């Protein structure tokens, strides 16, 4: 029973931490997209699932919600797929002429194959340009694109619900109404593309990609600052009073307890903890080290044998210190730098295996999350801050499909002055996915050996 509860505790705390941190990461992408005027159709806590609880924003059209698959979150930013469909402008115009229409009817009218029409509809659906059409009692088929589509509400300028404040709701059509485009087919498609990720310039694309990473780093930084300032930091006190004694240690067997005041070690008088530390170090290797200490106003003495490679098992007294904002910020920033340096070492062949052996998968994170939660809120939030740093910097690695990999592709395209072929981007993404699958298996195996077996 204890084992089951331990596993459930690890799963709960691990999922809670990772889901919130990934959700915040995706929240960064969502906010950046909205700032750049890019449409976002969905923003969910949890992975995509046919079962969910959601609310559709009347102001920006985005569907906000939560799914049962609490393994992170996602923001459906329009236009992230680099696919280009040549007939998309004709299909879009036809849908808005009819208001509501089926894929077979579109194919017949435009003299296109149903596959081409469906591909165009999938692209336009991902752009937030059209909506699926389901008749009363009809439900979506999981894993399949709809075969019937309808228009979105449009105002005279062509803005729709996903365009936020620019959308003139009072003078707009209703969903499924036919609507006359104010320009030509190609021009209207270009206008729709301008509201997507693909329709933005290099700087805005880079900002959207980096926003999630920035939010993770900022989250970790603020968490640590809050902990250091509010909960405080436990620091050793330079007195000769023992704070803690390890159970079963040499000191414990000699009768020394926490709270005892060390008066001398091997004849050397001690008034500070540094005196105690130095005296123990100098006496190591002797078989008859005399230790005098005081407890409840009475003096006691004992003798211990301490080999050079052994520890006495005593710790200094500690106190909680609340740091000022500047010191808290400086200390928090040092952890940011340490995490960044660790991730950079991962890219150095001579350190790759060393860093991987020190890394952990979701199993290790779950176990350590449970342990941190048991130690108290401050410890749990400190651990969450470090994981947030790691999540942010790991996403910065130049390996697709991570944000850093996507940014690398954007940089290459900017330098080359043209888009990389879709086939090349797809191959690079598959290689990146395969690499991370191998890394996940390696770290999962290490975690199983470390925490389970």
Predicted regions and their residues:
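Hydrophobic membrane-insertion alpha-helices, especially the h-region
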Residues: 16, 211-229
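Short amphipathic alpha-helical interface segments
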Residues: 84-112
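PDZ domains, with a preference for the canonical peptide-binding region formed by the helix
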Residues: 264-290
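Small-residue-rich helix-interface/hinge motifs
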Residues: 6, 10-86, 116, 120-190, ...
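Alpha-helical transmembrane segments of multi-pass membrane proteins
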Residues: 18-22, 216, 220, 387-395, ...
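Conserved PDZ fold ligand-binding element
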Residues: 103, 109-110, 251-274
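Terminal peptide-recognition signature
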Residues: 25-28, 66, 251, 259-262, ...
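Functional transmembrane alpha-helices
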Residues: 2-5, 174-207, 231, 235-246, ...
